[in-house]
Amino acid sequence: MNEFIYPEARLIAGVDEVGRGPLVGAVVTAAVILDPSRPIVGLGDSKKLSEKRRLALYDEIKDKALSWSLGRAEPEEIDQLNILHATMLAMQRAVAGLHLSPDFVLIDGNRCPALAMPSRAVVKGDSLVPEISAASILAKVTRDREMCELDLQYPQYGFARHKGYPTAVHVEKLAQFGATPQHRRSFAPVRNALLDAELAAAVARTL
C-alpha cells in the first residue's frame, strides 16, 4: 500500500460501501476500528482479492478488530432518497453501530456523510487505508452472501453470478420475468422493465 498520513487520533474508523451500482438489493456499508496490537496481513481493496482470501480476511477482521459494524439502506430507501443519499445514510448507520465511538472517521471516496465526529474522504481509500480496506471486505462479503440468498429465492435471475449488477444477462432476465420486490424501481433498467410490462398488459387488455 502507498503511504497514507493518518490524522492525529486514537480510535480511527474506516468506512466503505458496496452495492451502489446494482439494480437490486440494499447498499451495504461497514465501519471498522482496527487493533494496532493485532495486525491483519494482506488487507486490500475487496474487489481485487480472490473470494477465498476475502472470506478468510472477513473472519479475521471480525475476530481482531476493536469494533466493527454493518449498515445498510434498503431498496425502498434508495428509491425514495436516491442512491447517493441512501449510501450516506447507510454509512451513518454503520458508524452509529460501533460499540466504541471513534475519534476520527476515514471514508472511502470523495464525500463524507454528516457525523458527530471529524471525518475525511479518501479517494481510493480501500487500497490506501487498512481500516477502509477492512470495511470494504466486510461490506462485500455481506452483500455477496445476500445476493446468493436472493438467488435461492429467485433462481431465474442469476443473482449469485452477477450480484445484481446491470449485466446483459440481468437486463435480459428483467425483461423476461419482470422486477422482484427487491429491485430498485428508480434505476432506469428496472423502471423500463416495469413500463414495458405495464404496456404489454395494457395491450393485452385491448385484444
Curated annotation (Swiss-Prot):
Keyword flag Nuclease: yes
Binding site for a divalent metal cation: D16, E17, D108
Compartment(s) where it occurs, according to its Swiss-Prot or TrEMBL record: Cytoplasm
Record field: catalytic activity: Endonucleolytic cleavage to 5'-phosphomonoester
Hydrolase recorded as keyword: yes
Keyword terms: Cytoplasm, Endonuclease, Hydrolase, Manganese, Metal-binding, Nuclease
Cofactor entry: Mn(2+); Mg(2+)
Entry note: cofactor: Manganese or magnesium. Binds 1 divalent metal ion per monomer in the absence of substrate. May bind a second metal ion after substrate binding.
RNase H type-2 domain ranges (all copies): 10-199
Xref: InterPro entries: RNase_HII (IPR022898), RNase_HII/HIII (IPR001352), RNase_HII/HIII_dom (IPR024567), RNaseH-like_sf (IPR012337), RNaseH_sf (IPR036397)
Signal peptide (residue range): none
GO biological process assignments: DNA replication, removal of RNA primer; mismatch repair
Main localization category: cytoplasm
UniProt-recorded Gene Ontology molecular function terms: manganese ion binding; RNA binding; RNA-DNA hybrid ribonuclease activity
Enzyme Commission code(s) on record: 3.1.26.4
Entry's family note: Belongs to the RNase HII family.
PANTHER family: RIBONUCLEASE H2 SUBUNIT A, RIBONUCLEASE HII
Name under which the protein is recorded: Ribonuclease HII
Origin species: Erwinia tasmaniensis (strain DSM 17950 / CFBP 7177 / CIP 109463 / NCPPB 4357 / Et1/99)
